[in-house]
Amino acid sequence: MSSVSPALQPRRIKARFIGPLALTLAFIMCVFAVAIYSIETRIRDRDLAERSAAVAKLFAQKLDKDTHKMMATLRAMMINQAMVNAFRQGDRTALAQQGGELFRSLNAEHKITHLYFIRPDLVSLYRFHSPAVFGDDIQRVTLQQARESQKPAHGLELGPMGTLTLRLVTPWRQDGELLGYLEIGEEIEHLLDEIRHSLAIDLLVLVDKRYLTPAQWQRGLDLLRGKIAGEEGQHPGDA
């Protein structure tokens, strides 16, 4: 009849507990890891939601501020009698003389990239940012809204190269006569840069290709290639 040495009995007792204890510890570690991951996920989601809300709020504030600035600019132009006469007569040369320097100043100091004089029939009379292009029908939403309501209308719209532009359109009436419409706009890239610096975050604007015409897509690609080529050719000391 065999007998177990007293020295081996504690080892057998320990062996019986090691397996269950190891499983218990492994289970506890798994639960702990899941809990930590869940907490980190909630913190990350909350941080993302707070950042998104901050971006949306700041973006709306900047759009509102710039819209008021553009409206003030248009009102100043509408009390310029020389511009009134030039617009009423459809005199492109006079418009260029009266507003050319103003547009250059607005572009350099306030990032204004678009300025239009548009006839009552929504045909472009003069583009300060592109004088050679005129006589085309303009069918943008903001212009249609301004015509239907006969009140200022503004909003973000895609430009001809797929760039987002804040546009403001207002009817121009003089002594009850509708002379046409004034449209002013700014591409919003500088607003995004300001938000990046203010909130220390990266922003990326994506445009669904389905909403672009082939011509817009190609012009956008050409513009992007030009920017990349310019940055690659820039000397580090010139940055």
Where are these regions (language model features)?
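Generic short beta-strand
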Residues: 115, 169-170, 203
